[in-house]
């Protein structure tokens, strides 16, 4: 079981040459653009899962679910675990199938956000939000690794520049989607 899981995250073998074949060249360029758009959109969605707490912070305090101090502790857990995870997950992303690695982190982060909606226990929030920090740390490294694998050193600066705007996309998506959801629920 354990080895099958490792095989799931194993880097795909490189595809043989054929750079002179025009059909393969077109396909290669299409895949590179798909990779760039996937990494940018994916990392933007990571931010939706990271910033959701900021949108609901005020109602949580006003309803007496948590105090500002408790929310500060919860938020600190995410960033402490995120820092440790970014170090280790950066190393792992560099040695794994980055598509699967990034997808796993995003899926787990989304599931944790969903679970947070079913609890009002401070300790459960600390544990889940810290765990969210771990899965969040899988996002940036995966995006950087995928761009590094698909773009030459001369092209990377341009694509990294555009990719780095993905957090702005994620922040906009967060505030718009959460606001729409809350207004829909509140009527």
What are these regions (language model features)?
Residues 59, 90-91, 180:
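Membrane-interface helix termini in secondary transporters
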Residues 34-68:
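Extracytoplasmic
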Residues 51, 79-87, 171-172:
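Residue-level signature of mid-helix packing/kink "hotspots" within the transmembrane helices
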Residues 84-122:
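Conserved MFS/SLC helix-loop-helix module at the cytosolic interface between two early adjacent transmembrane helices
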Residues 2-48:
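Cytosolic juxtamembrane N-terminal segment immediately preceding the first transmembrane helix
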Residues 121-129:
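Short hydrophobic/alpha-helical segments at membrane-entry points of transmembrane helices
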Residues 128-165:
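Cytoplasmic helix-loop-helix junction between adjacent transmembrane helices
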Residues 161-178, 182:
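Glycine-rich segments within core transmembrane alpha-helices of 12-TM secondary carriers
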């Amino acid at each position: 079981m354990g080895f099958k899981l490792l095989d799931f995250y194993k880097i795909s073998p490189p595809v043989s040459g054929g750079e002179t074949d025009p059909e393969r060249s077109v396909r290669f360029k299409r895949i590179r653009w798909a990779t760039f758009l996937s990494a940018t959109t994916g990392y933007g969605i990571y931010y939706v899962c990271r910033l959701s707490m900021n949108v609901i912070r005020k109602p949580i305090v006003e309803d007496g679910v948590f105090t500002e101090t408790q929310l500060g502790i919860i938020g600190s857990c995410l960033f402490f675990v995120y820092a440790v995870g970014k170090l280790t997950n950066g190393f792992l992303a560099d040695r794994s199938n980055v598509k699967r690695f990034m997808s796993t982190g995003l899926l787990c982060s989304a599931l944790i956000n969903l679970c947070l909606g079913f609890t009002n226990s401070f300790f459960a929030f600390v544990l889940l939000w810290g765990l969210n920090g771990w899965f969040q740390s899988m996002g940036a490294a995966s995006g950087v690794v995928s761009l590094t694998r698909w773009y030459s050193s001369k092209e990377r600066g341009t694509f990294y520049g555009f990719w780095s705007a993905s957090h702005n996309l994620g922040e906009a998506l967060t505030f718009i989607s959460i606001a729409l959801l809350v207004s829909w629920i509140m009527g």
